[in-house]
Design a protein with these regions (language model features):
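N-terminally biased helix-coil "hinge/interface" segments that flank
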Residues: 1-559
């Protein structure tokens, strides 16, 4: 038996899944101040339906990291950069507390310029004097040689043990220095909050006496273990939108071109499925104005949800925040959900309360309640359609989007909008009708996020870089470095076997060994190194992954 729990900003949803059937579902308000209690409430409603059967795995999706970064509530964090030669320092506008230091490594990992120890001492003293307790360190080509990052890390540990540090070579083995620096910075900013969240999960699991694998849903639609997430919490950014994307795919499953529209209480998430495959952001997740090395779906969030409150200020306003539940569910203020409830005669909750609160606002606005509802419905539909169309303009630049048009020899055409979330039944059919496409709603659409979390499989990508003339190799994630036993005649097949073995080792460490056989290579590159008039060796770059997808036993659910 499997449990999926989606911890949203407004509601926490849970699903108990067994052998192709959803056995139980639950939806509870999220208590940000006491998250453990929310998790316990969800577990307490799901577990009785499991009886004596063992819960094999529990998967959580969460907006914790997304909300921390979006609201600017992350703790003040410093970034020490060793950019070497190239771009001017003002090109790296990543954060306010940024410090540049000398020290250069070339693209082969050779040290060109050593650290200036006095300069580093001065930078660390300034960081400590400012009261900053978190530091990210990023050196250009540290994925080829991390010696300078390690030196700074060791100095911080020795001289300032109360300051936590994250280094880029442990976060990502990929090239593109600005993205690696940004990813490391956001990791350092969120790691302590994530550790607290992980501790609350562990406490809730322990208090209910469960002996289950605990996984977290990542931005790429796969999962990793809770322990692994504590080292790379940034990979959980957009975990919520990933859950809705996989949940929408799990419920619909046909090979159609679909927009997944997840209408939550506070926000709406938009994602695209092309021919049954989610569209990925080719440049990685974008946090603010910065691209990162986080693999993620191409998603967008709109500050509009079913609980978005309504107001009058010279005109009807649909606010980008909530003041509690919809009136039909006992709230004190009229919301988007209430307007759709009355306009479409949906009979959701206490429809009389919806009508009463809307009538009060209509009187304030000097209009009939029916006109108020009409205006709200139009505002919401137009705002969502505008957001979808803006996303299409962005998606047109994604390689997978263009490839689909080339392969199918026709322009991309949207087939349907998949509705996810409690408010989807009210809003999505209206949006789809206005866009002249089909809408898809399932009985389990309100808890599709939790279903998506429950039935996706663990994922892992390993990248190996080998430089035979320098007798060096590196493996990511984790910042593994080593020397070659035989650097003479290494061939691509040997490099692939080496990458496969590291993937298997990491799978064993993370309890994913049973999925290792499903791995595939996504990058196989080799380059000859010429010295004088002859070849002196080769450089290999190999990538192997267990790609995102559903667990083998998932074949869909019945309505």
């Amino acid at each position: 038996m499997l449990i999926g729990i989606d911890v949203g900003g407004t509601y926490t949803d849970g699903v108990l899944f067994k052998q192709g059937a959803i056995v139980a579902t639950v939806k509870k308000p999220t208590d940000d101040m006491n998250l453990k209690n929310t998790l316990l409430e969800v577990l307490d409603e799901l577990l009785p339906s499991a009886g004596e059967q063992k819960i094999e795995r529990i998967v959580f999706s969460t907006t914790l990291v997304t909300n921390l970064l979006a609201t600017g509530r992350g703790e003040r964090t410093a970034l020490i950069m060793l950019p070497g030669h190239g771009l001017p320092h003002d090109a790296y506008d990543i954060c306010p507390d940024i410090f540049f230091a000398r020290g250069t490594v070339d693209f082969r990992g050779n040290v060109i310029e050593k650290l200036d120890q006095k300069e580093i001492d001065d930078i660390l003293a300034r960081i400590a004097a400012a009261g900053i307790k978190r530091v990210a360190v990023a050196a250009k080509f540290a994925n080829r040689n991390d010696i300078m990052e390690r030196e700074i890390q060791s100095k911080l540990a020795a001289d300032y043990p109360d300051i936590s540090v994250s280094i880029s070579s442990e976060i990502s083995n990929k090239l593109n220095f600005p993205r690696r620096a940004a990813t490391t910075y956001f990791t350092a900013m969120t790691v302590k909050e994530w550790m607290r969240f992980a501790a609350e999960i562990n406490q809730a699991i322990t208090e209910r006496g469960l002996d289950s694998e605990v996984h977290i849903l990542k931005a790429d639609g796969g999962t990793f273990s809770l322990d692994t997430s504590s080292r790379r919490p940034c990979e959980t950014v957009f975990s919520g939108p990933a859950a809705s994307t996989m949940g929408g795919l799990a419920l619909s499953q046909p090979n159609l071109n679909s927009v997944v529209l997840d209408i939550g209480g506070t926000t709406s998430d938009i994602a695209l499925i092309i021919g049954g495959e989610p569209l990925y952001a080719s440049k990685g997740a974008r946090l603010g104005k910065h691209y990162t090395h986080i693999n993620a779906f191409a998603v967008n969030s709109v500050a509009l949800g079913g609980d978005s409150c309504l107001d009058y200020d010279g005109g009807i306003k649909v606010q980008n925040f909530r003041r509690g539940a919809a009136a039909c569910f006992g709230g004190d203020y009229p919301t988007v959900m209430d307007a759709f409830n009355c306009k479409m005669a949906l009979g959701i909750g206490n429809a009389g309360q919806s009508a009463e609160k809307l009538q009060q606002l209509a009187a304030k606005a000097g209009m009939e309640s029916s006109e108020l509802c009409r205006q709200v419905v139009n505002i919401v539909i137009e705002r969502l359609i505008s957001s979808i169309e803006a996303m299409f303009r962005e998606w047109e630049n994604e390689p997978a989007y263009k490839v689909w048009e080339v392969v199918n020899r026709r322009k991309f055409k949207l087939d349907q909008i998949i509705g996810i979330g409690a408010a989807a039944t009210a809003i999505v059919p209206q949006v789809a009708a206005r866009m002249e496409v089909d809408s898809f709603l399932h009985d389990y659409s309100p808890v599709a996020n939790a279903l998506g979390a429950a039935v996706v499989r663990p994922t892992l990508a390993v990248e190996l870089h080998v430089d035979t003339p320098n007798n060096f190799f590196s493996v990511g994630p984790g910042g593994i470095r080593g020397s070659l036993n035989d650097r003479g005649g290494m061939q691509l097949g040997e490099a692939k076997n080496m990458a496969r073995q590291y993937l298997l080792d990491m799978c064993r460490e993370q309890g994913m060994e049973s999925y290792a056989s499903e791995s595939s290579f996504y990058m196989e590159e080799q380059f000859n190194i010429i010295s004088g008039w002859s070849r002196s060796g080769k450089i290999f770059d190999v990538g192997i992954q267990i790609a995102p997808g559903f667990i083998s036993e998932y074949k869909g659910v019945s309505s």
